């Protein structure tokens, strides 16, 4: 992965953390680990293993597969995929319907 791709991914993770925190999640950045989720998010006693995707093309099946593989036992998975050229994210959480979250402020 090139440095511009890593920078884009890092920007996406930072934006995702801000969005999660605006929705009362507590977040821990896990992106330094290769075989783990990008973010560990906690809310209401539930731990979420979050995969963040900041790509032009959203591939939900591929993203879900990676999220499931990286979620540790006892942790639910979540995928946050940035919708290109918007302030919105497609969010899919284990056991819930996909939805769109929009960044506030800016």
Mark where each language-model region is.
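Catalytic phosphate/metal-binding cores of nucleic-acid and nucleotide-processing enzymes, i.e., regions
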Residues: 1-106
């Amino acid at each position: 992965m090139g440095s511009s791709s890593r920078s884009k991914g890092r920007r996406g993770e930072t934006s995702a953390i801000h969005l999660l925190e605006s929705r009362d999640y507590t977040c821990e950045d896990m992106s330094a680990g290769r075989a783990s989720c990008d973010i560990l998010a906690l809310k209401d006693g539930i731990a979420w293993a979050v995969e963040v995707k900041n790509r032009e093309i959203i591939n939900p099946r591929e993203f879900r597969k990676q999220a499931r593989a990286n979620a540790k036992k006892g942790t639910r998975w979540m995928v946050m995929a940035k919708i290109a050229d918007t302030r919105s994210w497609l969010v899919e959480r284990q056991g819930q319907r996909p939805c769109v979250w929009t960044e506030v402020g800016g």
